[in-house]
């Protein structure tokens, strides 16, 4: 190949890469504006308040997160030893809990595989902490479509925790989760852009996550407004969207559950 032909080919490759990057950015900003169905309580069908883990309980029998409001309602009906959703008897120790998870893992349940990865990562349920095993499980769950697994992989690759640091790979997993409505992943993309000096793009990411009810994103936009990196109209829009999202997640049962636990 002549020098001229090689230069043309290289220019074409660069142009193709730039086009692919632009297309990805367009898809990234156009999708993931609504939280995934997995963030809804399977009983009342309302989105669970953020952070999800603090306002719901995972039931390993069916791998469904039930909001604290529906959990309270179940207790008020005398359901203390069975799952509010599938009515299976609840496990009472680590061994039986792990057995329930493993049973669903063996059937290829992406939520169970992701959940088991979490347990290995933190060394819970009597399991020895094993980050490598956690990453294996998260990778399998991500291939099956688990949004949570994409998020977890984004963190370990970006930080190099238990695996060789690979920030582009971490960002890739973060983008995949964000495009499916994962709030924390969307917020983290804003952090990445902020650290790269792309303040306008960072605010756009935080606008999306703030409108989904994520308070840290709203607070960050407020700080960006004070620093002159965000317009007053952007903060006002984010605040209105945040309030609407929070209001939609409220219910009398949930408020009662919070009152009883505080």
Locations of the language-model features?
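Short helix-capping/linker turns of helical repeat alpha-solenoids
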Residues: 63, 106-113, 120-124, 138, ...
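Cys/His-coordinated zinc-finger cores
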Residues: 61, 65-79
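Structural signature of tandem alpha-helical TPR/SEL1-like repeats
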Residues: 93-100, 127-137, 163-173, 196-205, ...
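Short cysteine-rich clusters marking metal-coordination/redox-active sites
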Residues: 41-44, 58-59, 67, 83-86
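TPR/TPR-like (Sel1-like) alpha-helical repeat modules
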Residues: 199-218, 222-251
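Proximal pre-RING flanking segment of RING-type E3 ubiquitin ligases
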Residues: 2-54
């Amino acid at each position: 190949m002549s020098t001229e032909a090689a230069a043309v080919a290289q220019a074409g490759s660069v142009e193709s890469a730039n086009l692919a990057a632009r297309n990805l950015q367009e898809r990234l900003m156009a999708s993931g504006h609504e939280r995934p169905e997995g963030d809804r309580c399977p009983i009342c069908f309302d989105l669970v308040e953020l952070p999800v883990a603090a306002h719901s309980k995972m039931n390993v029998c069916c791998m469904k997160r039930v909001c604290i409001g529906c959990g309270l309602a179940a207790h008020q009906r005398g359901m203390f030893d069975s799952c509010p959703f599938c009515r299976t008897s609840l496990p009472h120790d680590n061994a039986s809990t792990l057995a329930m998870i493993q049973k669903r893992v063996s059937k290829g349940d992406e939520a169970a595989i992701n959940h088991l990865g979490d347990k290995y990562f933190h060394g819970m349920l009597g399991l020895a902490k094993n980050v490598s095993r956690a990453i294996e499980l998260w990778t399998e769950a991500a291939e099956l479509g688990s949004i949570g697994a994409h998020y977890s992989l984004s963190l370990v690759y970006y930080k190099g925790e238990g695996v060789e640091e690979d920030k582009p790979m971490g960002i890739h997993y973060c983008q995949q989760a964000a495009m499916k409505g994962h709030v924390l992943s969307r917020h983290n993309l804003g952090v990445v852009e902020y650290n790269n000096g792309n303040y306008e793009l960072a605010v756009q990411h935080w606008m999306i996550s703030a409108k989904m009810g994520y308070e840290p994103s709203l607070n960050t936009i407020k700080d960006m407004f004070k620093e002159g990196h965000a317009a007053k109209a952007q903060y006002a829009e984010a605040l209105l969207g945040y309030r609407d999202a929070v209001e939609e997640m409220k219910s009398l049962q949930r408020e009662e559950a919070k009152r009883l636990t505080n």
